Curated annotation (Swiss-Prot):
Protein's membrane topology: Multi-pass membrane protein
Annotated catalysed reactions: Ca(2+)(in) = Ca(2+)(out)
Annotated keywords: Calcium, Calcium channel, Calcium transport, Ion channel, Ion transport, Membrane, Metal-binding, Mitochondrion, Mitochondrion inner membrane, Transit peptide, Transmembrane, Transmembrane helix, Transport
GO CC, alphabetical: mitochondrial inner membrane
Organism per entry: Arabidopsis thaliana (Mouse-ear cress)
Homology family: Belongs to the MCU (TC 1.A.77) family.
Subcellular location: Mitochondrion inner membrane
Superkingdom in the source lineage: Eukaryota
InterPro entries: MCU_C, MCU_fam
PANTHER family attached to this UniProt entry: CALCIUM UNIPORTER PROTEIN 2, MITOCHONDRIAL (PTHR13462:SF34), CALCIUM UNIPORTER PROTEIN, MITOCHONDRIAL (PTHR13462)
Binding-site residues, Ca(2+): 259
Gene (UniProt): MCU3
Protein name: Calcium uniporter protein 3, mitochondrial
Length: 336
């Protein structure tokens, strides 16, 4: 019995201590604990005794916070390290950069006026190509208008296209005739233009031209004489060759022996004429051979006499210019 009373007393004391500790615990959130721990009168400090270790925990917390804060402040990046830190963050990657976006391309469309210009230019080029295909220099105006009408979808536009070609100087309309190649007209008119200096008999260039012309005449005579000597020498060589073949054929040998010899000699002459044509681009005839040898002798003599051929040609073009064959056509068209 005594043992039971002792055990029950011990258990009762343990229960009281446990309930008291629960009531006094700071982490308890029950209403009973709040009512018990929080006094009604703030001046009464005798009801609740502070738990052992509360002051120590507070001091420890304040000490730790005081020790941590300076360390955290010292670890903050400053200066270049801050710039590197910002570069590592690189917040611009997630941003939308509008400055790099190009505006949408505008669609280029032809206006009605531009389309008309292109069609007109195409029609004019077609007309010019057709006129070149004819190979003619002059054409009646009616035929010219009909050609212009064939180039367009509407035949009535032929007169308008003809007028545009005339205004742009692609053709020259003279009365009822049309000159398809104005460049020939220009060259012909250049020969008809009066030049006052040319008609001056005391012009020093005219005197120079006469001297060069006289010197060239002497060179031409000498070249002609040399070429004539070569031609006579060639004729003598052919006569001797023919006489030699006749003697070999009828006196020394027979025709059976001379026939292949004459064939091969003729083949050699043919090959020589073919080579002459390849070199000079002239027909292998007596006249072609004469012209080729005359030009060769003339160049050789000009080099010996130091004759200025370029100056002579320039002065000859200036003082001895002759109108071309198209002048008569132009004058006839103008008169008509």
């Amino acid at each position: 019995m005594a043992m039971r009373k002792l055990l029950s007393k011990k258990l009762f004391n343990i229960t009281n201590v446990a309930s008291q500790s629960l009531m006094n615990c700071r982490i308890s959130s029950s209403s009973l604990a709040v009512r018990t721990r929080v006094p009604n009168d703030s001046t009464d400090t005798t009801k609740i005794a502070p738990e052992p270790g509360d002051l120590a925990m507070s001091r420890r917390f304040m000490h730790n916070s005081a020790m941590i804060r300076p360390a955290e402040i010292m670890q903050m990046p400053v200066g270049e390290s801050l710039i590197e830190k910002l570069r590592e963050i690189d917040g611009s990657k997630d941003r939308i950069r509008l400055d790099g976006l190009s505006p949408p391309e505008r669609e280029t469309s032809l206006t009605v006026a531009d389309t008309k210009k292109l069609l007109r230019a195409a029609q004019i080029e077609i007309v010019k190509s057709k006129l070149r295909e004819t190979g003619r220099s002059w054409m009646p105006y009616k035929e010219f208008v009909s050609v212009c009408g064939e180039a367009s979808s509407d035949p009535d536009l032929g007169s308008k296209i003809a007028k545009m070609l005339d205004d742009s100087a692609n053709v020259i309309v003279l009365g009822d005739s049309v000159c398809i190649r104005p460049d020939q007209v220009t060259k012909s008119i250049e020969g008809l233009l009066p030049l006052p200096k040319i008609h001056n008999p005391n012009d020093p260039r005219r005197i120079e031209f006469k001297e060069l012309e006289a010197e060239k005449a002497v060179i031409d005579v000498k070249a002609h004489t040399l070429v004539r000597k070569e031609l006579w020498a060639g004729l003598g060589y052919l006569i001797l060759q023919t006489a030699g073949f006749m003697r070999l054929t009828f006196w020394e040998l027979s025709w059976d022996v001379m026939e292949p010899i004459c064939f091969y000699v003729t083949s050699v002459y043919f090959m020589a004429g073919y080579a002459f044509f390849l070199r000079t681009s002239k027909e292998p005839s007596f006249e072609g051979f004469y012209q080729s040898r005359f030009e060769a002798k003339q160049r050789k003599l000009m080099n010996e006499y130091e004759f200025d051929l370029e100056r002579y040609n320039e002065l000859k073009k200036l003082f001895c210019s002759k109108p071309s064959d198209h002048v008569s056509k132009i004058l006839g068209a103008i008169k008509s």
